[in-house]
Amino acid sequence: MTHSIRIGTRKSPLALIQTNLVIQQIKQFVPDINYKIVPITTSGDLIQNKPLYDIGGKALFLKEIEQALLDKKIDLAVHSLKDVPGRIPEDLIIAAVLEREDPRDVFVCLKYKSIEELPQNAIIGSSAVRRKTFIEKIRSDLKVTVFRGNVDSRIKKLMNGEVDATILAYAGLKRLNAFNPQYCHLIEYSQMLPCIGQGVIAVEIRKDDNAMLETCNQINHLTTFELIKPERAFLEYLDANCRTPIAAYSKYLDKDNIETDFMLGNLESSKITFHTETTNIKTSKEAGIKAAKIMLSELER
């Protein structure tokens, strides 16, 4: 039997690369598959001159794709998990993830190797409030300016001198073969916790599509799927948006236990709080919710 799958994705070079990685995985288990990539322009792609938190948040990168899924114009959607809100339409599910790439951020700068080395009042291009929060924690004198666009366009803006530096995700740079050690420098977790789900490619389907669910079960990287549960539970409980400084990073302590570092901030009060939870994989979601409750309480003091 020949399968035919319509795969929805954004039009960016990175999104198309990630979609092809999903296709490669599916072909290992369903070799006779026919597939059609359906590139979709999202609202987030169209509006480039404003910060995401002013126009509706990262959900704008999913809205049109999820609608196509609900309308049965596509069979599955491929996303960067970091762009997926904690709460998605109830008729859809994240049915699979690929193995997580290194989720660290990268300091991209032509002259300096770290945020600390930048000259006084230097300009860093970044539209993410998470990154802005960490940058200001490290160097309060630096100016953080709105910096939108795909990876290639942001690097070009940097090369053209529009900013002194920017921060990008290592996973995207690696997949685009754009990590250049001459001007790309990894930032350690101790200095900047990653975005929730960073480095993970996610597959979203309709909840009632049993055929697609069976396919997704075959490609799902279970250790990554378990690893992101406390991060996603934290995000879902807080129903956080792009105005909320939020971060989390999970790692395995052994095959049954996960440690997750969380960060939550409040832009109005400029408060930031950190918390760590260690949990068995069977209760990892509860750990994310517990962390959210503790940290909300700390911010309210």
Curated annotation (Swiss-Prot):
Keyword vocabulary terms for this entry: Porphyrin biosynthesis, Transferase
Pathway in which the depicted protein is active: Porphyrin-containing compound metabolism; protoporphyrin-IX biosynthesis; coproporphyrinogen-III from 5-aminolevulinate: step 2/4
Transport recorded as keyword: no
Gene3D superfamilies: Periplasmic binding protein-like II (3.40.190.10), Porphobilinogen deaminase, C-terminal domain (3.30.160.40)
Enzyme Commission number(s) of this protein: 2.5.1.61
Family named by the database record: Belongs to the HMBS family.
Protein name (record): Porphobilinogen deaminase
GO MF term set: hydroxymethylbilane synthase activity
Originating organism: Rickettsia canadensis (strain McKiel)
InterPro entries: HemC, Porphobilin_deaminase_cofac_BS, Porphobilin_deaminase_N, Porphobilinogen_deaminase_C, Porphobilinogen_deaminase_C_sf
Enzyme class: transferase
S-(dipyrrolylmethanemethyl)cysteine modification, residue list: C242
Catalytic activity reported: 4 porphobilinogen + H2O = hydroxymethylbilane + 4 NH4(+)
Highest taxon in the source lineage: Bacteria
